[in-house]
Amino acid sequence: MFRSKRSGLVRRLWRSRVIPERDGGDGNGQSSERNATAVTAEGQRMAQPRRAQEGEGRPVRCCLFAERPGPELPPPPPPPPPGGASPPGPGGGEARSRLVLLERELKAVTYALLKRLKERSLHSLLQAVESRGGTPGGCVLVARGELRLGAARRPPPHLLLGKLFRWPDLQHPAELKALCECQSFGAADGPTVCCNPYHFSRLCGPESPPPPYSRLSPNDEQKPLDLSDSTLSYTETEATNSPNVTPGEFSDASTSPDAVKRSHWCNVAYWEHRTRVGRLYTVYEQSVSIFYDLPQGNGFCLGQLNLENRSETVRRTRSKIGYGILLSKEPDGVWAYNRSEHPIFVNSPTLDIPNCRTLIVRKVMPGYSIKVFDYEKSCLLQHTAELDYADGPYDPNSVRISFAKGWGPCYSRQFITSCPCWLEILLSNNR
């Protein structure tokens, strides 16, 4: 009997799910996109002999059903007497059986959701999952109603697929933020919701450091960074007239005749250490992708910027930029979404401690987004803050983002100009 094409797409999606390396995660809140492994059925079969040698077998734990009550397990057997053999205990077998049951339930509810989708939506979803967001695809809209899993748990569709394909430790829809290009953006109460997991990012709280920044030094979570390098802040004029600017050839759609008629909301400068590479990239659209290599899409391609005699450190860092970031202008401020597979580091006037001689650098893990500039807070700071605390030039509308490499007291690089590859976002006052 022939299987339908839709059934084949559903099976491919199920085999592309993310399986955590550790049961329940590592507890540090780190992005599961770095700590999880996307496996296929073939990969699982190849891993079976090795798992059999590991004793416990490391079964997959389904986070979706973690809170669902199950049968009570018997107490662990007493330890074996010294020199005696360990008696067989039923507890381990029952625990593994329960995990297998939970995995089957997860598969059943996933299939139930995916079989609702049309073939075109399944293609779009599979394209996004297999490219890991390089080709995000279109919106995959489903009714906002929740899926029924017995009487214990009813996850929304976008939460289910977000856990399945990106973040196994995801617990609540409030942790997700729809990207500005998604139809679910700004439509929290709409009748439908997009369930494409690559149309969402995880939120970094503005008042707490993004995970896992505390892993570097628990005592330094709120420790501000020293701003004693007068080259840290540049105005747009200074950046344009910088003697270290090097020419670069790249496609710049922002200079088209139609774009010139509109007002821009920011300029982007790309730096390697103290040298600016290429010209300013002017942004007119609501969002812009800044990347090294992207399978589909347009924006500011850093891979096309040429510079002679690049150091090996810069070359290695450039190779880590990958899909880069998505920078978007939204009603409440400017947001940065980390699309790459490595962390980015952000400094912004609205992330700093007011009236302080130091600044704060935020570490943003892959798959997370952060509000890098808050319009309301910026207006408040410019009316109340004293600028005497700044050492050297200070631009209240400038944001700095370093790829893969941080700076400050936790690193050997004390200043942003010591980072191999970084961006300066020069925001326009005309909002």
Swiss-Prot record:
GO cellular component: endosome; heteromeric SMAD protein complex; nucleus
Single GO BP term: SMAD protein signal transduction
Subcellular location: Nucleus
Keywords associated with the record: Metal-binding, Nucleus, Transcription, Transcription regulation, Zinc
Family listed: Belongs to the dwarfin/SMAD family.
Region annotation Disordered: where it falls in the sequence: 1-95, 235-258
Keyword Nuclease among record annotations: no
The name this protein goes by in its record: Mothers against decapentaplegic homolog 6
Residues that, per the record, bind Zn(2+): 139, 182, 194, 199
Biased composition (Polar residues): 29-38, 235-245
SUPFAM superfamilies attached to this UniProt entry: SMAD MH1 domain, SMAD/FHA domain
Domain of life: Eukaryota
Main location: nucleus
Ranges where the MH1 domain occurs: 85-209
Gene3D superfamilies: 2.60.200.10, SMAD MH1 domain
Domain MH2: residue ranges: 265-431
UniProt GO molecular function: chromatin binding; I-SMAD binding; metal ion binding; transcription cis-regulatory region binding; transcription regulator inhibitor activity
Biased composition range(s): Basic residues: 1-15
UniProt biased composition (Pro residues): 71-90
Role according to the record: Transforming growth factor-beta superfamily receptors signaling occurs through the Smad family of intracellular mediators. SMAD6 is an inhibitory Smad (i-Smad) that negatively regulates signaling downstream of type I transforming growth factor-beta. Acts as a mediator of TGF-beta and BMP anti-inflammatory activities. Suppresses IL1R-TLR signaling through its direct interaction with PEL1, preventing NF-kappa-B activation, nuclear transport and NF-kappa-B-mediated expression of pro-inflammatory genes.
Disulfide bonds: none
Tissue-wise expression: Developing heart, eyes and limbs.
